[in-house]
């Protein structure tokens, strides 16, 4: 079977799997085992289920990224045209998740409004379309997906807020520290290294073979994603600083965007 067809089968399966997780597994699981979940409004339950799906996606894709980075010699040897099969499968899983999440945001926009996440998803789609259809830039696509490793900590911070865990408590502080460190490492600290590798490909035969479409999609999506990452890093650092500086008995104002 053609790799492109396999990729789109994985996209479809990923979409259906994550939708099942959102609409059936998560509600039943947490209705049975979480009294907090049962007391939430419909909108908050939707966001809870969405973040549960997001965490599962991040763990699956992030783990696969690390494996590919460590053991896929073909991709590491030729970052533009190396054998992209496993990267394409991982990207397909992400694309299926993004479709599910975008449809979810559209359906529940009034209660889950997040324009920054929509911009993020569309930028990812723009670039990953070339990975799925042409199998180009596998190393750089995989490198980008490693950023998902920070997502579970971001979601856990939200879960702590919802269950009423004080932001000055040790579990919340430790998660906040881990979130800030991992987010910085996988999304911010890697920026110089990433772009140095990008610039190193300019003018090479492999880069020229890409053509203008993939070249523009690659650079534009990277710039958009990194602007968003820097913005989110600032908000995370600011929020963590506020919590650390707050009085132990203080109750900082909760803001989903913090």
UniProtKB/Swiss-Prot annotation:
InterPro entries: TLC-dom, TLCD
Domain (TLC) ranges: 43-245
PROSITE patterns: TLC
Membrane topology reported for the UniProt record: Multi-pass membrane protein
Superkingdom classification of source: Eukaryota
GO cellular component, one term: endoplasmic reticulum
Protein name as annotated: TLC domain-containing protein 4-A
Transmembrane segments: 5-25, 52-72, 85-105, 116-132, 171-191, 212-232
Localisation: Membrane
One Pfam family recorded for the sequence: TRAM_LAG1_CLN8
Source species of the chain: Xenopus laevis (African clawed frog)
Protein family (similarity comment): Belongs to the TLCD4 family.
Gene label: tlcd4-a
Any one biological process term the GO annotation gives: lipid homeostasis
Keywords assigned: Membrane, Transmembrane, Transmembrane helix
């Amino acid at each position: 079977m053609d790799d492109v067809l396999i990729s789109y089968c994985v996209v479809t399966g990923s979409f259906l799997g994550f939708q099942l997780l959102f609409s059936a597994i998560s509600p039943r699981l947490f209705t049975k085992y979480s009294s907090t979940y049962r007391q939430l409004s419909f909108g908050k339950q939707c966001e809870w289920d969405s973040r549960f799906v997001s965490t599962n996606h991040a763990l699956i894709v992030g783990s696969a990224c690390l494996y590919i980075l460590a053991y896929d010699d073909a991709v590491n040897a030729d970052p533009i045209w190396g054998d992209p099969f496993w990267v394409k499968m991982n990207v397909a899983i992400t694309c299926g998740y993004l479709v599910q999440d975008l449809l979810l945001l559209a359906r529940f926009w009034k209660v889950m409004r997040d324009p920054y996440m929509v911009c993020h998803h569309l930028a990812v789609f723009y670039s990953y379309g070339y990975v799925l259809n042409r199998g180009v830039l596998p190393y750089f696509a995989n490198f980008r997906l490693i950023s998902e490793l920070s997502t579970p900590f971001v979601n856990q911070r939200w879960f702590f807020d919802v269950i009423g865990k004080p932001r000055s408590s040790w579990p919340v502080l430790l998660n906040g520290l881990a979130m800030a460190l991992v987010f910085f490492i996988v999304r911010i600290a890697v920026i110089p290294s990433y772009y140095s590798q990008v610039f190193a490909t300019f003018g090479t035969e492999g880069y020229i073979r890409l053509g203008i479409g993939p070249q523009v999609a690659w650079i534009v999506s990277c710039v958009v994603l990194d602007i968003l990452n820097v913005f989110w890093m600032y908000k995370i650092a600011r929020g963590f600083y506020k919590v650390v500086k707050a009085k132990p008995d203080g109750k900082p104002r909760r803001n989903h965007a913090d």
